[in-house]
């Protein structure tokens, strides 16, 4: 067996058609093809699954039952496999404790660095807290110039009020004759009476010594006596010189602030030892949001201004409010904003113990009749959220709460002891908040002592290597404290790449899923260089990718096709990018060679003359910008990664419009105002989330075409004779479905330490319905046959039924004709799910006043798919609607009517509008990175 290639024989996973393919090892290999052609089936479900399965199979049967073992892929043989690591976009942790720092393991090295070379600084007195052994204290004194006169003092009172008579008695009992009070030396018999209300310092004079040979033993005794009397502190007063304060434990001698021994766990917000006790290491606390509770202060109490207390199923709170208002003389018909301030405060925070009489009788005859204080709506929501055992109630209360930075730790997640430790005047929380490019500079400029340099060198190398990689893949705008759950799929994948680069493994098979997603063309070169570095370490990279630059940079290209679904699953072309470009059978090759291309529109739409205007957008890194969105156009929001695109569109525009149009309680990002929304009726977010959460959901049920098909079957003569209604043809309810598998068509068999096996139901043979239901036919086909049809076949089959035909034709129009009507929604890719949502919008009757938002709709799409997607978006705009896309793909940007380019950089250096206008106008703005790359596409 050759060691320089991976040989796959007879792969039949999903739509793969018994293919044989050779993949060269230690090279960067791209697998490309149309969406749904079988790329992921080959890369992830065949190659990765078999590599992972073989590893797990090498473990004991006991260990295997705890691991999620993968099914053996349907393939005859795979030779030359290495241990495989999959880096996709679906496995990002949503745990709030998972951050960029923890995922990349930079946090582990940072914690070690602070534990080894950090300096504890008292937060109150701003002096360094040090700890020395008696031997170190003695050495410090011995190192002083010979004949230096010193006195060793025990500081027993530090800045405390009082006359301290008992302290003087104790000193006398201990046999000491001299002490220093507020800087003046006194004999114990001559101590003055101290002012009671003044703060005093009192130190016992333990010994007076001249530095010379032979005093080490005497110094030891004196220091031990001072430490015993002053609870671990000793003060050396150099006569006519300075003072040296010593401590045998980490504690401030002035305020008593203590810190334990520095160890890495002190700097972990995921460990009780280091986490902030107030927020449990999360950095945020849930607080009731007054604006969510009272979104419309112009309303009155009677009109329901206090939203959480509006009657849904009970009159309890409305009646309580009315009776309290009567008692406290609050007018129910005055707008909340015009009520006196003290009445507003009472409604929000309660009556401060003042009672009112409350009488309430529920629907079951229960009566409450008592004098109670009025709780106030904000306190009521907070109490109910924390006290309830009901998930429903907690979820309801959560709607009116917001996360605010914890005031105790300032959002740094750590306790005061961890945050007092500094390196170059910054604590670990402050370092975690720096953008990665600034953090790199911080570590490059680090000033350490010679000994600290030796300790820190290997730790700093690990930190800097990972930070440099994050910078190289275009993520230098992120901070290490950024929650992993807030990252896009592309960002998360590139962060996991950073971890792998840091591990410096070789001989590994890496399988990646579109690492270029979410990356601006400017940053693509750096990503490609990083991928090549992984290859040069002796690894094999198999990348599912559509990006032209990445394909051209690859060593080997595999084009899967020719179509999607049943029309795909074959190897169309293999070889270098140049060889594939010359292959006339390869659709990818035609785009690489320039024979096919997405044309530049001949003219740009002018819109309907109306616009939505957003003023003062200042969320995250947005710099108080004002943006206009012309209606009736295809608008592209562009910019480098981290420039503020998602903040502008998803956090402000989408939420602000939803709040105005739908009275949505989701609070939009920081902005002054939004106007012009009266010109639209609906805001529709078409994202890549699954169209259904269960395997029972499918394209037929999602588009509601299955309702029409069931109506059609219920109208057949056979159904009428048998008395079958529409419900008989549903696989979700009893009656027509097979009860052995409950309409699933398959049965799960648990295998414990082997993966679960799914087998066709023995009763219905995978058809989902009982035999009586399957006897009803339309044009010779039963309901199960229809669900197994591809959409392309179904369009032809139902072409005489306009209602069904129109819905199915829109699915074909978005390029999904290859999927089956009954295909489980959970098997659709993100791009397929998004296009299915677009299809459902296309067949709806539109009044041309919809505002569609799409976030990177080209994710997972081949250039040919993008051409089809653009036609769909243009159909929506041609109906008078507005389509707003966040996009990096230059084919989409050049096809837009209006472009808003944010930047110029990511993070704090972004957040401004660099260019706006038609693609041609943006291309002429020299400061715009998007414009520079766009120019080539417009020529």
Question: Where does each model-flagged region fall?
Answer:
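Conserved phosphate-binding elements of NTP-dependent enzyme cores
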Residues: 1-939
